[in-house]
C-alpha cells in the first residue's frame, strides 16, 4: 500500500517583512491562501521565528486543515549534538524531547521538526543517532532534513562520492529521504534541462527502496541566482518538474519557494511575493498540485512494476539506481512504442488491469510537439490528463497522443 502523497514547500509565511511584524489579519489571509494553493505541509519561514509565532502558525495551520513543521533552534541544537553528550542517556533524551515538545503537541497540526538542510556527510552520524532517539520520543512526527543533489561540490558534501553521501543518511530512522535537484536552467539565453536529473532520482529511489523509505523531491517554483535556475513562471515548467518526479516514484513533492525569501534580490517569482501577494508561480503550482492529487487518487491501488524513459529515441529502463538498456518485460499489454521527443514513463498493474503513466521530458519551453505512440491491444483507450478522463479510438491497438508542455497522461485499455 502506497503512503499518502505529500505536497509541501520551502520558505514559509514569515513573522516579519522588512523588519515590520506581520499582523494577525495578514497572517489569517496568508494561511488561507497557502491552503488554497494545494500545499498541505506548511513550511517554516526562512528567518528565525519567535516561539509565539511558531505557536500561532500551528493554530493557523489547524484552522486551514494543514500540517505545520516547526523549526526550533533549541531542539535543533540539542538533537544535532546529542551523540556528543554521553552524559545524556537515551532514556533521559527521550524524556527531554517529549517534555520540551509538549507545547507543540497540543496542536494536532504539529507535523514535527525541521532539523537541517543540505548537511554534509560529516553530520550524518549525529543525525542518524538523534533520529533513532527522536523516533522513540515522538513516533509519527517528522525528523525532517533535506539532502544535497549530486551536482553539489565535494567541498559541500565533504566526500567525493555522492553514493556514499546518500548511503550515510539512509541509515536515519525516518520514513523518507528528501533531496533537491533543480533541473531547469538558463545560460546565455538558452533554456535546458540540467544533466543528471534522471540519474539522481534513480539513485535516491534505489536507496529508498532498499531501506523501505519514501522518496521526497523538490521542484523549483522560485527562479534564483538571478534567473540561472528557472522556476515555475509557466505551467509547463511547473508540470515538467512535478510530474517527472512523480512518475519516477516521488511520494513527496516540495516547492522551492512558497514565500519569496527575504534574503537577497536573486529570488524571483515565488508563489507569493515578499509583500504577501500571489506571484506568477502561484496559479501554475496550484493547478499542478490539483492535477497531482487527482492522478494519485486515480491510480489508487495500482502498483508500479516498471519505470523507464525514451531518450533521443532510445528506450531506457530505470533499474539498479540508473538508466539501463535492459529490455522491458514481454508480458506488458500496455507499452510505449515511440516518442517524438524525450519522455519518462511508469507501468502500473492492479490485478489484471494495466496502464502506463507517460510524462513529457522535453524542455518545457521548447515549443516542440511530442506525439507518443502507445500499444494498448484494445479498440479504445482511456486517457487521464489534467485531472480529466477521455476515451480515444485506437487504430490497430495503438494510440497516438500529443503531449503538451510538461504534460502527463495515464493510458489504460478499454473496449477489448
Outline where the language-model segments fall.
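Glycan-processing catalytic domains of CAZymes
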Residues: 1-378, 385-416
Amino acid at each position: 500500500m502506497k503512503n499518502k502523497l505529500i505536497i509541501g514547500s520551502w520558505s514559509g509565511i514569515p513573522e516579519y517583512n522588512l523588519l515590520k511584524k506581520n499582523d494577525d489579519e495578514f497572517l489569517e489571509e496568508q494561511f488561507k491562501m497557502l491552503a488554497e494553493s494545494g500545499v498541505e505541509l506548511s513550511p517554516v519561514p526562512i528567518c528565525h521565528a519567535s516561539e509565539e509565532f511558531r505557536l500561532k502558525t500551528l493554530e493557523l495551520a489547524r484552522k486551514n486543515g494543514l500540517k505545520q513543521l516547526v523549526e526550533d533552534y533549541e531542539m535543533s541544537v540539542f538533537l544535532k549534538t546529542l551523540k556528543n553528550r554521553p552524559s545524556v542517556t537515551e532514556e533521559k533524551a527521550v524524556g527531554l524531547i517529549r517534555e520540551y515538545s509538549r507545547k507543540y503537541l497540543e496542536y494536532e497540526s504539529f507535523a514535527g521538526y525541521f532539523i537541517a538542510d543540505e548537511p554534509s556527510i560529516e553530520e550524518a552520524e549525529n543525525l542518524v543517532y538523534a533520529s533513532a532517539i527522536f523516533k522513540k520520543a515522538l513516533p509519527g512526527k517528522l525528523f525532517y532534513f533535506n539532502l544535497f543533489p549530486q551536482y553539489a561540490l565535494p567541498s559541500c558534501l565533504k566526500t567525493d562520492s555522492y553514493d556514499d553521501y546518500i548511503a550515510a543518511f539512509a541509515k536515519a530512522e525516518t520514513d523518507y529521504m528528501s533531496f533537491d535537484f533543480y533541473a531547469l536552467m538558463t545560460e546565455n539565453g538558452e533554456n535546458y534541462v540540467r544533466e543528471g536529473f534522471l540519474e539522481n532520482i534513480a539513485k535516491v529511489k534505489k536507496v529508498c527502496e532498499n531501506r523501505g523509505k519514501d522518496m521526497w523531491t523538490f521542484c523549483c517554483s522560485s527562479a534564483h541566482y538571478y534567473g540561472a535556475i528557472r522556476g515555475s513562471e509557466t505551467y509547463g515548467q511547473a508540470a515538467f518538474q512535478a510530474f517527472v518526479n512523480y512518475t519516477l516514484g516521488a511520494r513527496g513533492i516540495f516547492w522551492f519557494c512558497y514565500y519569496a525569501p527575504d534574503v537577497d534580490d536573486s529570488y524571483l517569482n515565488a508563489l507569493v511575493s515578499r509583500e504577501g501577494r500571489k506571484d506568477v508561480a502561484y496559479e501554475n503550482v496550484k493547478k499542478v498540485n490539483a492535477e497531482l492529487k487527482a492522478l494519485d487518487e486515480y491510480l489508487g491501488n495500482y502498483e508500479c512494476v516498471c519505470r523507464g524513459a525514451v531518450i533521443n529515441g532510445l528506450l531506457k529502463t530505470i533499474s539498479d539506481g540508473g538508466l539501463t538498456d535492459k529490455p522491458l518485460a514481454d508480458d506488458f499489454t500496455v507499452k510505449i512504442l515511440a516518442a517524438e521527443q524525450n519522455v519518462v514513463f511508469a507501468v502500473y498493474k492492479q490485478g489484471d488491469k494495466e496502464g502506463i503513466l507517460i510524462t513529457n521530458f522535453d524542455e518545457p519551453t521548447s515549443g516542440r510537439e511530442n506525439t507518443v505512440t502507445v500499444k494498448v491491444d484494445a479498440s479504445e483507450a482511456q486517457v487521464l490528463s489534467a485531472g480529466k478522463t477521455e476515451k480515444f479510438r485506437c487504430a490497430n491497438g495503438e494510440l497516438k497522443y500529443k503531449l503538451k508542455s510538461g504534460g502527463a497522461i495515464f493510458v489504460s485499455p478499454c473496449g477489448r
